[in-house]
Amino acid sequence: MATLDDDINSGVMTGRLRALAADHALSVLVVDDDDLERTLIGDRLAQRGIKVGEAADGAQALEMLRREKVPVVIVDWHMPVMDGIEFTEKFRAELPGDTYVIMLTARKEAFDFERGYQAGVDDYLTKGVPEPELIARIHAGLHTHSLRVQLRDARAALQLATRRRDGS
């Protein structure tokens, strides 16, 4: 039976990631004040054909996201200017949409997870996560984003059909 590691190493996951990310100029935004952390994640994703953007803090990330929508954001909790929690709350309030937000942080207490989810993150990972799991979560995020877009479009089509039917 194939494992997740087998799928990633054989290129199966890479092909799926590329297919899910193909429609976007930028597929994943990595938000972390640690240059090395951003580079490591960015390089791993770029090797899989994923288009990656980088921001050093939440304020910079919000500016970027006001200009361009991104299917997946990976955000650290502790950053100067605007931390990951404040970023997520502002992002969800100002730019509601289909973006999947993954909190990737060193914080790992139960109340930290709860606070992250309350702020609006979709997924919560602790730093040091094995690469196959990170890739799988990004894959899940891209897939979830795709489903959210399809649902939004289906709702809009249904509303239009209902208005036409009702003559409004």
Which residues does each predicted region cover?
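Non-catalytic signal-transmission and effector/linker regions of two-component phosphorelay proteins
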Residues: 1-27, 153-168
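Acidic, metal-coordinating helix/loop segments flanking the phosphotransfer/catalytic sites
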Residues: 54-72
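Charged docking surfaces used in two-component/phosphorelay signaling
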Residues: 39-43, 47
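Receiver (REC) domain active-site loop signature in two-component systems and cognate sites
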Residues: 79
